[in-house]
Swiss-Prot record:
Chain segments annotated as coiled-coil in the UniProt record: none
Alphabetized Gene3D superfamilies for the sequence: 3.30.160.810, Translation factors
Disulfide pattern: none
Protein name per the record: Large ribosomal subunit protein uL3
Region (Disordered): 123-147
NCBIfam families: L3_bact (TIGR03625)
Family: Belongs to the universal ribosomal protein uL3 family.
GO cellular component terms, semicolon-separated: cytosolic large ribosomal subunit
PANTHER family (alphabetical): 50S RIBOSOMAL PROTEIN L3, LARGE RIBOSOMAL SUBUNIT PROTEIN UL3C
Originating species: Streptococcus uberis (strain ATCC BAA-854 / 0140J)
Keyword tags: Ribonucleoprotein, Ribosomal protein, RNA-binding, rRNA-binding
Single biological process term from Gene Ontology: translation
Function recorded in the entry: One of the primary rRNA binding proteins, it binds directly near the 3'-end of the 23S rRNA, where it nucleates assembly of the 50S subunit.
Length: 208
């Protein structure tokens, strides 16, 4: 069965295992997620569980949003997302970090840091040209393609907005779960800036 939870990225730190191994970890704070709606094939055409995370002031919510969360007897939520293949949950129930345990393999989704307008070297990893000896080609994108089509093909590596994309890193290991602090420690780094929304769910391609 799939497990999933929403949280916020706190930052990175490092821990030592009992064997003395040094592990860099990302700290994810995941306060209890509230189930707002259970979608079924009969009512919605597909099966999913809609959860809400991070309370917000009622004055910031409109009347339909307040009525939607009132069915779960909870406060309006800042983030609302859906998880599929999750069973055994009812409207108003909570998903906590205790649903995960150390050693679980998960997929983590976040929004990568925005870098603004960048050139092809930083954005696509393109090699630069010679910097001396009369060269007039340094950090430019290079050839636009052959003459015959009379146009530039799609997906040509050019300068542009970099970052700010939805990124998923697969098969990350949960090192430790701290229920009293609503914290999950994940091995390695995860996409996103501090305080950004992070989605954690069971790995799709985990080794059987």
């Amino acid at each position: 069965m799939t497990k999933g939870i929403l949280g916020k990225k706190v930052g990175m730190t490092q821990i030592f295992t009992e064997s003395g191994e040094f592990i860099p970890v990302t700290v994810i704070e995941a306060t209890p997620n509230v189930v707002l709606q259970v979608k079924t094939v009969e009512t919605d055409g597909y099966e999913a569980v809609q959860v809400g995370f991070d309370d917000k002031r009622e004055v910031l919510s409109n009347k339909p949003a307040k009525g939607h969360v009132a069915k779960a007897n909870t406060a309006p939520k800042r983030f609302i997302r859906e998880f599929k293949n999750i069973e055994g949950l009812e409207v108003g129930s909570e998903i906590t970090v205790e649903s995960f345990s150390a050693g679980d393999v998960v997929d983590v989704t976040g929004t990568s840091k925005g870098k603004g307008f960048q050139g092809v070297i930083k954005r696509h990893g393109q090699s630069r040209g010679p910097m001396a000896h009369g060269s007039r080609y340094h950090r430019r994108p290079g050839s636009m393609g052959p003459v015959a089509p009379n146009r530039v093909f799609k997906n040509k590596h050019l300068a542009g907005r970099m970052g700010g994309n939805r990124v998923t890193i697969q098969n990350l290991e949960i090192v430790q779960v701290i229920p009293e602090k609503n914290v999950i420690l994940i091995k390695g780094n995860v996409p996103g800036a501090k305080k950004s929304l992070i989605t954690i769910k069971s790995a799709v391609k985990a080794a059987k």
